[in-house]
Amino acid sequence: MINLFRGLLVVLCFASAMVAAEEKNILVTSGSDRAAPIAVVPFGWQGGNVLPEDMAEIISNDLRNSGYYAPIPKQNMISLPTQASEVIFRDWKALGAQYVMVGNITPAGGRLQIQYALFNVATEQQVLTGNVSGTNDQLRDMAHYIADQSFEKLTGIKGAFSTRMLYVTAERFSENNTRYTLQRSDYDGARAVTLLQSREPILSPRFAPDGKRIAYVSFEQKRPRIFVQHIDTGRREQITNFEGLNGAPAWSPDGSKLAFVLSKDGNPEIYVINLASRQLSRVTNDSSIDTEPFFGKDGSTLYFTSDRGGKPQIYKTNINGGGAERVTFVGNYNANPKLSADEKTLVMIHRQDGFTNFKVAVQDLARGSVKILTDSNLDESPTVAPNGTMVIYATRQQGRGVLMLVSINGRVRLPLPTAQGEVREPSWSPYLN
């Protein structure tokens, strides 16, 4: 059964092109605009012990990861103010900074009080000020919060730095001894915790829209089944146990339904189940492989991957009935669709030519243009931040599966720190506050 499941995925993910793509759209390989220089000055600390986290570094990294801002390195800073009255704007103008943030951390009754301020260097005006308090263990949370507030103030886009990520690791100890672990971490890979361990594969973890539940595929008892697990309690509920393939779960926007792939009737097709009534509905009916469903925010539109045209491409359909409409036309392979929050951009795995050149790309759904975001060759499983500014994906580096982050504008691309072993199957959480 495992071999059958993997075989079907290989057929879909690595099928060679049979005919040339219809070139309706255009391909763009990079952008040329520039990130805004910003300085996040090391926060002042009034306590005696060394703090376990560097607030300024976390905030700088968050803003950098968005692709909107280019942090100025600490070693280049002319002065190190920790409060508003100490800011010398000519220092920051000399460095070309557009914005500067200062902050101060004070111990207060077993907690930490953090005050911060953000300035526009050109106008020398304060654009944001605030304070937040918490414990030592909450320093990363507070740093992500400040980054969220700053990003939203400057861009009008809600920050997504306080979100979480799911991923799966596989550690092979011998030929028949591999440990699979489902992990949850901060979006940047920090503070990973284990949600599930198994000697059998774990696939396709997905956060529910409420952020409190997850769905995934487990090969316990040597066959694929879909489970829903409550994060806080660990309580699990088996959702499917059909013969053949049970895979690729995807939540509806209201969390009341799951779409997934079943082959119980002989061919991999997409189904939707109502989690309350357990009513199962078949959505696709084609002789091809249909897989990787993803709901639009209306709860009725379903994007999916199919090779019904002879090669994997992305289609959309309505779960209540009707035909499928092809969405992608650039390249000989497009798969694993995800939508940005505003549904203007489709994120996918794209191959322009060849047999192993799989990259993360985005398609403007209004214009049809496609832009490649990555320069690696074996990318898979893209997942999009809830504000649409960043993508995390799995790829291979030096023979090992790793996770990477790329900004949607293509300016930033970097590896994420994760546990040992093969790392795969990332999934971004919704907003959690």
Swiss-Prot record:
GO cellular component: periplasmic space
Family matches, as InterPro entries: 6-blade_b-propeller_TolB-like, PD40, Tol-Pal_TolB, TolB_N
Domain of life: Bacteria
Species assigned in the record: Pseudomonas syringae pv. tomato (strain ATCC BAA-871 / DC3000)
Principal location listed in the UniProt entry: periplasm
A Pfam family assignment: TolB_N
Subunit comment: The Tol-Pal system is composed of five core proteins: the inner membrane proteins TolA, TolQ and TolR, the periplasmic protein TolB and the outer membrane protein Pal. They form a network linking the inner and outer membranes and the peptidoglycan layer.
Keyword Repeat: no
Organism lineage: Bacteria, Pseudomonadati, Pseudomonadota, Gammaproteobacteria, Pseudomonadales
UniProt keyword Plastid present: no
Coiled coil feature spans: none
Protein name in the entry: Tol-Pal system protein TolB
SUPFAM superfamilies: TolB, N-terminal domain, Tricorn protease N-terminal domain
Family according to the record: Belongs to the TolB family.
Key words, A-Z: Cell cycle, Cell division, Periplasm, Signal
Gene Ontology biological process: cell division; protein import
Functional description taken from the UniProt entry: Part of the Tol-Pal system, which plays a role in outer membrane invagination during cell division and is important for maintaining outer membrane integrity.
Signal sequence extent: 1-21
Compartment(s) of residence: Periplasm
